[in-house]
Amino acid sequence: MYGASGGRAKPERKSGAKEEAGPGGAGGGGSRVELLVFGYACKLFRDDERALAQEQGQHLIPWMGDHKILIDRYDGRGHLHDLSEYDAEYSTWNRDYQLSEEEARIEALCDEERYLALHTDLLEEEARQEEEYKRLSEALAEDGSYNAVGFTYGSDYYDPSEPTEEEEPSKQREKNEAENLEENEEPFVAPLGLSVPSDVELPPTAKMHAIIERTASFVCRQGAQFEIMLKAKQARNSQFDFLRFDHYLNPYYKFIQKAMKEGRYTVLAENKSDEKKKSGVSSDNEDDDDEEDGNYLHPSLFASKKCNRLEELMKPLKVVDPDHPLAALVRKAQADSSTPTPHNADGAPVQPSQVEYTADSTVAAMYYSYYMLPDGTYCLAPPPPGIDVTTYYSTLPAGVTVSNSPGVTTTAPPPPGTTPLPPPTTAETSSGATSTTTTTSALAPVAAIIPPPPDVQPVIDKLAEYVARNGLKFETSVRAKNDQRFEFLQPWHQYNAYYEFKKQFFLQKEGGDSMQAVSAPEEAPTDSAPEKPSDAGEDGAPEDAAEVGARAGSGGKKEASSSKTVPDGKLVKASFAPISFAIKAKENDLLPLEKNRVKLDDDSDDDEESKEGQESSSSAANTNPAVAPPCVVVEEKKPQLTQEELEAKQAKQKLEDRLAAAAREKLAQASKESKEKQLQAERKRKAALFLQTLKNPLPEAEAGKIEESPFSVEESSTTPCPLLTGGRPLPTLEVKPPDRPSSKSKDPPREEEKEKKKKKHKKRSRTRSRSPKYHSSSKSRSRSHSKAKHSLPSAYRTVRRSRSRSRSPRRRAHSPERRREERSVPTAYRVSRSPGASRKRTRSRSPHEKKKKRRSRSRTKSKARSQSVSPSKQAAPRPAAPAAHSAHSASVSPVESRGSSQERSRGVSQEKEAQISSAIVSSVQSKITQDLMAKVRAMLAASKNLQTSAS
C-alpha cells in the first residue's frame, strides 16, 4: 500500500531470478535437477501523503481526454483509442439473451449465495445449521430417542465364564430387519385432504414420504439456506435425492413445502407409526416378561418410548383433584357468579365446564396451563385436511363434547357420589348498582391451538413472557429482525395461536401480580394523596404523582377500565374478568419486580425523599396539572388487563425508574457542587480577611455591621430590588441646616467602643461560621457580604463617599482606603458621568442599603456636610434627577460648594497615595471582583426584569 513503485519492481526481479536460476542449477547437477531461488529484501516506507493521494484517486488520469473514464498508468486501456468494441453494454450475453422467469429466480438465488458474506455471519450461520441438522437427524430417526449410539450387550464386556450366545442376537436382528423392511416397503397413499396435482409423482413408500415431509417442515421453519446446506451434506445419500432440481420427487417436495407455508398441510406421518407402536405395546410387554433371565434391564433404565407430543397434549382434561384449591375456586366462582347462563360471542349458550374427579392431581396441574383457555374452553387440534369437523370431533373419547360455537368446550359427567352443581343464580351486587356482566367467553372466538414441539415450546414461552413484561414494542422489534427461530410471531404461522395464548396468559399474570402489590398502598384515603406529595418516596405507593404523568402520557385509559369515578369522588368497583385457570407462578419469577420496587421505595435519606417527592409532584404538574393522584380500589380477584392498561403500567414503571435514577444523580451532583461551593466560599472568605487585614479597621467595622444584619443582606441578595418606575419619585433626602451635630463628632471614645463591639461581633460570627452547625448560614453570609459590598447602586455610593470625606482629621486618614475600596468596585457600578447611566443607577434601592444609610447618617457631623460632593461627581446625578423625580436636584448651598473645592484639592494628593497602596492588592481584588461582577450584573438584570413585568 505504501511501497509505491519501488515495491512493485522487486517481485519482478524475484520471479526473473527464479527463471534464470533454473537452467543454471540444472547444468551443474547432472541427472539431478536442482533449483536455486534467491531474492532481495524489499523495504516498505510509510508515506501517508502518497497513500492518501492514492486513496482519493489523484494519480488517475482521464482516458483519451474523457473524464468519465479514469485510468492509472498501468491500465491496458491506455493503448486503445476506441473502447466501443469491448464495451460490456453491447457485447454481454445478458443483453443478447433474455432470462426466463425461472432462470431469473435461479440467478437471484445465485446472487444471494455470492454476496451472502456481506450481510450474514457465516460462522454463526454454519453453527446454527449444524444444530438444525442434528435436530433433523433426530426427527428422522424412527425408534426411540438415543439413536445416535447403538446400545449392545457383551461386546465390550466379555466374560469368559458366561457362554457366548450368538443365536438370539442374530434372530433379533433378522426380526428387526424384517419389520423395517415391511415398514419401508409399505406403499404411500396420499391422504384425502391433500389434493396433489396430476402431473406430480408421489413417493413410492411411506418412509420416503415421511423423510420428504419432515425435511419440508424443517426447511419451512429454518429457511432456504438450510435446504442448501442439507443438499450439500446429503449429496451422497440417495434418500435426499429429491432435493435436486432434476429428481422426479422434487415437484412433490416443493408441493408439500408450499402447502405447509400456506397452512394447508399439517404433519401426518407420525400418526401411523404411533398407532403401530400402540398396537405393539402388549406384545412388547410379553417379550419383556420373557427376557427376564440373563440380560435383565431395570425399567427405569429403558430409553423412553418416542410418543407423539401433539396427541399427548391434545388429550382432553378429565382429571381434577376435588381437594385441589383450583376446584374449590371454581365452585366458589360458580356459586357467587352474578351472571346468568353464559353466552358465547355468537350467541350460542355455552355449558359450564365440569370435570371428572380422580386422585391424580399432578396430571391436572401439569395440563392446566396447556389447553385450558381463560374462557373455560379447551384447545383441540384442528381436523386433518379433508376430514369433516363434526365427524372428527365425534370420534373423540367419551366425556368430551363439542358445542356448535367456534370455541370448543368439553364437559364431563360429575364424579360418582357428588351431585351436579346447581346453575348459578343472579344476585345483586353489594353496592346496589348493576355491574356490567362479564361473560365467561369474553375473548373472541378462539382458533384451535396447536401446541408446539418440545424444542420450540420453551422459545415461545420465554418470548411470550418477555413480551408480557416489556411491552408490544419488544415483539415488533423481534419480528422486524426476521429471525427464523421467531417465525411464530407471524400471524400465518401454525404456532402463532399458541404464542398469543401464552402471551395473554403472562399478561394476565403480570397484571394480577402487580395489582396485588399495588393494592396495599392504594387503600390510603384519597384526601391525603394530593396534600403530601413528598411522602410518596417513603411508603412506596405507585399511585403517586409520577404515575399520573405516566398515565397522562399513555392515554389515561387505565382508570376507566379498573375503576369508575363518580363525580362526588367515590369509586364504584368495576366488574372483574373470569378466573384464569393456570398454575400459580413461582416466587422466583416475581423477584425482579420486587427488587425494583424495593430499590425505588427504600430511601432512608430524608433529603432524598423530599427531593423525589418534589420531582414527582413537579412532573405531575407539568404533564397534567388538572389531574389529582387517583386512588384505585383493587378487587381481590385479578381483573383482565387490556393492552392500553399494560402499556400504561409499563410506562409508569419505567418513569418511576427514571425519576429515581434522576433523583440519585441530582443528589450526587448537588453534594459534589455543595462541596465545591464550600471550598470556593472558604477561599473567598480567606481572601476577604486578607484584604481586610491590609486595609484599616474601618472596613472591618463595616463588615461587622453587614454581618449584624444577615437577614437583611439575604433579602437584598435573593429578593429583587424594588425599582421605582413611572411617576414614583425616589424618597427625597432633606437638606437640613447643621443645627444638630452628630454624637460621633462630640465624643470619639463612644465611637471607639462601638467599633470594638463590632469587632467582637465579627469574631463571634467567624467562629460560628467555622462550626458545622452554622456552616450553611456562614456560607450565605459570606456570599451576601461580598455581594452587598459590590452591588451598591450609584446613588447610595455617592452618599457614602460624601459622608466619608468629612473635615475631621480622623475621617481624613480613612479617605484613601475608602477611595481604594471604591476603585476596586467594577467601573460599571460606579457613578457614571453620562446622564443616562446615572438615571439607571439611581433608581434601584434595597432596604438593606437604607439601613446602612441611616447608620452612616448618625456618624456624620451634620447632614448638610454629608451632602457636599465634588463637582465632577455631582455633575452626574444632577441631570438625572429631574427624570427620576429625585431629591438630588436640590440646589447646592455655598457652604457645600466651598467644602467640595477644598476636598477636590485634597483628593489629588490622596489619589496618588491610593494608587501606590492599591497596587499591592489590585491583583487579588481583580480576581474577586471579576467573579462578583457577573453575579451582581445578573442580579440587577433579574430585578429589573421582574419589576418591569410586575408593572
Curated annotation (Swiss-Prot):
UniProt subcellular location: Nucleus
A cellular component term, taken from the record's GO annotations: nucleus
Feature: compositional bias, Low complexity: 426-439, 615-633, 718-733, 865-900, 915-926
Bias kind Basic and acidic residues: ranges: 9-21, 169-178, 592-601, 646-682, 736-755, 814-824, 901-914
N6-acetyllysine PTM sites in chain numbering: K315
Biased amino acid composition, Acidic residues: 284-294, 536-546
Basic residues: compositionally biased ranges: 756-790, 798-813, 838-864
Signal sequence residues: none
Main location: nucleus
Residues with PTM Phosphoserine: S283, S604, S832, S834, S905, S909
MF terms (GO), sorted A to Z: RNA binding
Keywords: Acetylation, mRNA processing, mRNA splicing, Nucleus, Phosphoprotein, Repeat, Repressor, RNA-binding, Transcription, Transcription regulation
Pro residues: compositionally biased ranges: 412-425
Residue ranges crossing the lipid bilayer per the database entry: none
Annotated spans, Disordered: 1-28, 155-185, 272-298, 332-354, 404-439, 512-569, 592-927
Swiss-Prot/TrEMBL GO biological process terms: alternative mRNA splicing, via spliceosome; mRNA 5'-splice site recognition; negative regulation of mRNA splicing, via spliceosome
Entry-linked Pfam families: DRY_EERY, Surp
Task performed by this protein: Plays a role as an alternative splicing regulator. Regulate its own expression at the level of RNA processing. Also regulates the splicing of fibronectin and CD45 genes. May act, at least in part, by interaction with other R/S-containing splicing factors. Represses the splicing of MAPT/Tau exon 10.
Name of the protein: Splicing factor, suppressor of white-apricot homolog
Naturally occurring in which organism (per UniProt): Homo sapiens (Human)
Organism ancestry: Eukaryota, Metazoa, Chordata, Craniata, Vertebrata
